[in-house]
Curated annotation (Swiss-Prot):
Residues 401-429 are annotated as: Disordered. PROSITE patterns: CLPX_ZB. ATP-dependent specificity component of the Clp protease. It directs the protease to specific substrates. Can perform chaperone functions in the absence of ClpP. It holds the Pfam family AAA_2. Belongs to the ClpX chaperone family. One of its GO terms (biological process) is cell division. Signal peptide: none annotated. This is ATP-dependent Clp protease ATP-binding subunit ClpX. InterPro entries: AAA+_ATPase, ATP-dep_Clp_protease_ClpX, ATPase_AAA_core, Clp_ATPase_C, Clp_protease_ATP-bd_su_ClpX, ClpX_bact, P-loop_NTPase, Znf_CppX_C4. GO terms for cellular component: HslUV protease complex.
């Protein structure tokens, strides 16, 4: 490996050029490399990396595979899961197709999720990102304001995605962003107002470009933009935006529209509350969203409408027990770490579900109900070594009674039982 020429000049160990022929030589243990070879190596690595991260249609799970994965974590909402699986599959297929030279360029289809509180909107979006192994970010629309006003700029949503992709911009450009509480940025009235609505219509206007696809300038540290600041450039054309909201009150708009169409002789008269919210949401039209307060341009950039139903008692009981990370399984694991067995009887599960329905909190309220009821016993267990089993009954939920507790005889503790088990295992081995 030549380091010197005959004139005792340093040479690049890779290309053989002398120090006079290059701008810079960098020394290593027994070797030298010039700036030109460094640039060449960087290009080769960048090209290879681009090939490895490039999306291939074959690597994107098929709609039925995506739905199967969603089924493992999300109970019910069959129609919504199918719609989302197809929409996500088509989105990533579109990314791959648009890279090729084709006559037809496929446009982006963002998704709007509508459903009552606690119906699983956020969980669906999070689970989609897991199955696809893409960066994911959640943003709260209520914190966003128009540029120049107190609050977060819309570009800060993109920063969260970049951070979750470990500042790999290229990977972030294929990610998913979930914007929650999107119904809270509806303008205050259907008719345009002369006063500025900086957290409603103003935010909708600010979101239009990034939803459609643009090269946005994002401050690396977040916050407001200011002159002489460096920006991260990110293209949002291939980012999938999923917007979600409860849209309280939109059911009345749908009901009024559907009522008008069934007036006259022979029309079937329905009671005022005959249809539930879930069924009404299935009949939603873009015009209903305009009446609710979303501007036409914003609705146009969310062409896929996916509605979720209110969860009934059976669905809530299944949510407590069936998913991979079901709440009952989580609490059993927590107790198991203290060598205590936890059991919920069927009546207790039914009572928890009924309480969640009464509170109108959906699946989100299940944890709060369990936590309220179990705080006292979880406080006692670590310091009471004689407790071995806890049973949650219907009375614990309805009458606020203490859970049933099984204890060891005097003089015995969970610690001594555990050490005896270890000794037996060692002896048998």
């Amino acid at each position: 490996m030549a380091k010197y020429d005959e004139k005792k000049q340093l040479k690049c160990s890779f290309c053989g050029k002398t120090q006079d022929q290059v701008k810079r030589l960098i020394a290593g243990p027994g070797v030298y490399i010039c700036d030109e070879c460094i640039d060449l190596c960087s290009e080769i690595i960048a090209d290879e990396f681009e090939e490895t991260v490039e999306f291939d249609t074959k690597s994107v799970p098929k709609p039925n595979e995506i739905k199967q994965y969603l089924d493992s974590y999300v109970i019910g909402q069959e129609r919504a899961k199918k719609s989302l699986s197809v929409a996500v599959y088509n989105h990533y297929k579109r990314i791959n197709t648009n890279k090729q030279d084709t006559d037809v360029e496929l446009s982006k289809s963002n998704i709007l999720l509508l459903g009552p509180t606690g119906s699983g909107k956020t969980l669906l979006a999070q689970t989609l990102a897991k199955v696809l192994n893409v960066p994911f970010a959640i943003a709260d629309a209520t914190t966003l304001t128009e540029a120049g006003y107190v609050g977060e700029d819309v570009e800060n949503i993109l920063l969260k995605l970049i951070q979750n992709a470990d500042y790999d911009v290229e990977r972030a450009e294929r990610g998913i962003i979930y914007i929650d509480e999107i119904d809270k940025i509806a303008r205050k009235s259907e008719n345009p107002s002369i006063t500025r609505d900086v957290s409603g219509e103003g935010v909708q206007q600010a979101l239009l470009k990034i939803l459609e696809g643009t090269v946005a300038s994002v401050p690396p540290q977040g916050g407001r933009k200011h002159p002489h600041q460096e920006f991260i450039q990110i293209n949002t054309s291939n980012i999938l935006f999923i917007c979600g909201g409860a849209f309280d009150g939109v059911d009345k708009i749908i009901e009024n529209r559907t009522r008008k169409s069934s007036m006259g002789f022979g029309a079937q008269i329905q009671g005022k509350h005959e249809k539930d919210i879930g069924k009404l949401l299935k009949e939603i039209m873009p015009g209903d969203l305009l009446k609710f307060g979303l501007i036409p341009e914003f609705v146009g950039r969310l062409p896929i409408l996916v509605t979720l139903e209110s969860l009934d008692k059976d669905a809530l009981i299944n949510i407590l027990t069936k998913p991979k990370n079901a709440l009952v399984k989580q609490y059993k694991k927590l107790f198991e770490l203290d060598d205590v067995e936890l059991e919920f009887n069927n009546e207790a599960l039914t009572s928890i579900a009924e309480e969640a329905i009464e509170r109108k909190t959906g699946a989100r309220g299940l944890r709060a109900i369990i936590e309220e009821m179990m705080t006292e016993i979880m406080y006692e267990i670590p310091s009471d070594e004689q407790i071995t089993k806890v049973t949650i009954t219907e009375e614990c939920i309805k009458d606020k009674e203490n859970p049933q507790v099984e204890r060891l005889p005097e003089g015995k503790t969970r610690g001594t039982l555990a050490s005896n088990r270890v000794k037996k295992d060692i002896e048998s081995a």
